[in-house]
């Protein structure tokens, strides 16, 4: 998968404005579209991307020069693309690109927007006003932030990410909870993430040794975002592509990407960077899932498959309680009938019970949980493409 550039208006492949509204995926998938993000997004089909990562201009122009204690100059963001006449102008810009993003986002898709205190609250307001539903705010704590050289404020050591679904009804969005938990030593992943800023060999430099892009994000940050909220084969959109971190990480992790960028030097750097990436293999990309992600199996399916017969006696692993399987898929015990969960709870005097793990059947003198039979059904469903 080599990245192609759809230049706007001069093209190495095709002109962005030549892309029909219902352009086939191959016309823009794994591509960098050159141009203004709003205009370029208008050429993509409705509901065509799974996840959006947006790193918009922060509007953080600094007044005057900044110097370190040794009087060396601090390299601040002074690019023209980060300049806005007023908050109103920035709000109008934000609303325009968010509206365009919302149209191309799938109903079950999600968007991530990163920013600093200069802009993230204004972005959050626009997200809510446009109908997006906020899922989390994530704090990226920097292990090596820039000091506050003037000593007039706290050291700014974090940036904020907002994660949102397309709307409140956007059910079924991807969140790889089990994978995130396993990666965090089997503890729930928190909403504060600790990563260093992009430095060293990862930082793109030009022939003079200067930074290619002033706000290049670390690949580890994008990798966590994609591993948390997407699946292999999903389409990741970055409307402010910059140096191509999103594309590089997407390619490595087996996701598709589409980037939008108007500055040719950034496009050149991103293209070379992405073309040098080697994708991981299928085994390395398999996402860990939990039971909530597995297909639902009714207890009657176990009986219909002939794995249990009416009249079978089930018991708990210590043989303290027993119940009889009935033909209709219910259990009966102590004169009461109900589901495997209800009867499991009733015999123990509990309010709830997982009947799949509580009830056991005997095979060759060995007790086994009926959950083992459910696993067989799920394997059959997977083999049949269910």
UniProtKB/Swiss-Prot annotation:
Gene: ccrM
Keywords tagged on the record: DNA replication, DNA-binding, Methyltransferase, S-adenosyl-L-methionine, Transferase
Reaction(s) this enzyme catalyzes, per UniProt: a 2'-deoxyadenosine in DNA + S-adenosyl-L-methionine = an N(6)-methyl-2'-deoxyadenosine in DNA + S-adenosyl-L-homocysteine + H(+)
InterPro entries according to UniProt: DNA_methylase_N4/N6 (IPR002941), DNA_methylase_N6_adenine_CS (IPR002052), RAMA (IPR040843), RM_Methyltransferase (IPR001091), SAM-dependent_MTases_sf (IPR029063)
Role, per record: CcrM-mediated methylation has important cellular functions. Contributes to the accurate cell-cycle control of DNA replication and cellular morphology.
Protein name: DNA methyltransferase CcrM
EC number of this enzyme: 2.1.1.72
Organism this protein belongs to: Brucella ovis (strain ATCC 25840 / 63/290 / NCTC 10512)
Similarity remark: Belongs to the N(4)/N(6)-methyltransferase family.
GO biological process, one term: methylation
GO cellular component, one term: cytoplasm
Pfam families listed in its UniProt record: N6_N4_Mtase, RAMA
Lineage of the organism: Bacteria, Pseudomonadati, Pseudomonadota, Alphaproteobacteria, Hyphomicrobiales
Uppermost EC category: transferase
Domain RAMA residue range list: 280-382
GO molecular function: DNA binding; N-methyltransferase activity; site-specific DNA-methyltransferase (adenine-specific) activity
Coiled coil: none
């Amino acid at each position: 998968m080599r990245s192609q550039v759809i230049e706007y208006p001069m093209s190495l492949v095709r002109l962005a404005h030549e892309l029909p509204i219902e352009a086939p995926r191959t016309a823009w998938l794994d591509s960098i579209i050159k141009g203004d993000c709003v205009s370029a997004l208008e050429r993509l089909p409705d509901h065509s991307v799974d996840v959006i990562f947006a790193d918009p201009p922060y509007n953080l122009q600094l007044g005057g020069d900044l110097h370190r204690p040794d009087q060396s100059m601090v390299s601040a963001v002074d690019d023209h693309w980060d300049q806005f006449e007023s908050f109103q102008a920035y709000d109008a810009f934000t609303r325009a690109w968010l509206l365009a993003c919302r149209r191309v986002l799938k109903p079950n898709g999600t968007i991530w927007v990163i920013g600093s205190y200069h802009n993230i609250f204004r972005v959050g307001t626009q997200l809510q006003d446009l109908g997006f539903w906020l899922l989390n705010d994530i704090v990226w704590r920097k292990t090596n932030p820039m000091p506050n050289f003037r000593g007039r404020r706290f050291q700014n050591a974090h940036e904020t990410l907002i994660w949102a679904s397309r709307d409140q009804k956007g059910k079924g969005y991807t969140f790889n909870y089990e994978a995130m938990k396993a990666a965090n030593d089997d503890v729930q992943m928190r909403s504060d993430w600790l990563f260093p800023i992009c430095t060293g060999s990862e930082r793109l430099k030009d022939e003079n040794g200067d930074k290619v892009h002033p706000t290049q994000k670390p690949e580890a940050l994008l990798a966590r975002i994609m591993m948390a909220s997407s699946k292999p084969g999903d389409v990741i959109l970055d409307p402010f592509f910059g140096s191509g971190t999103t594309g590089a990480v997407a390619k490595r992790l087996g996701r598709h990407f589409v980037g939008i960028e108007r500055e040719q030097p950034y496009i050149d750097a991103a293209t070379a960077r992405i073309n040098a990436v080697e994708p991981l293999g299928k085994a390395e990309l398999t996402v860990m899932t939990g039971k909530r992600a597995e297909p639902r199996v009714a207890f009657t399916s176990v009986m219909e498959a002939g794995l249990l017969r009416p009249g079978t006696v089930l018991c708990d692993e210590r043989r303290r309680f027993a119940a009889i399987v009935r033909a209709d898929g219910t259990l009966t015990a102590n004169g009461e009938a109900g589901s495997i969960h209800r009867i499991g709870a009733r015999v123990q005097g509990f309010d709830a019970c997982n009947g799949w793990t509580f009830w056991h059947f005997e095979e060759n003198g060995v007790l086994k949980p009926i959950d083992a039979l459910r696993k067989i059904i799920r394997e059959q469903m997977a083999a049949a493409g269910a």
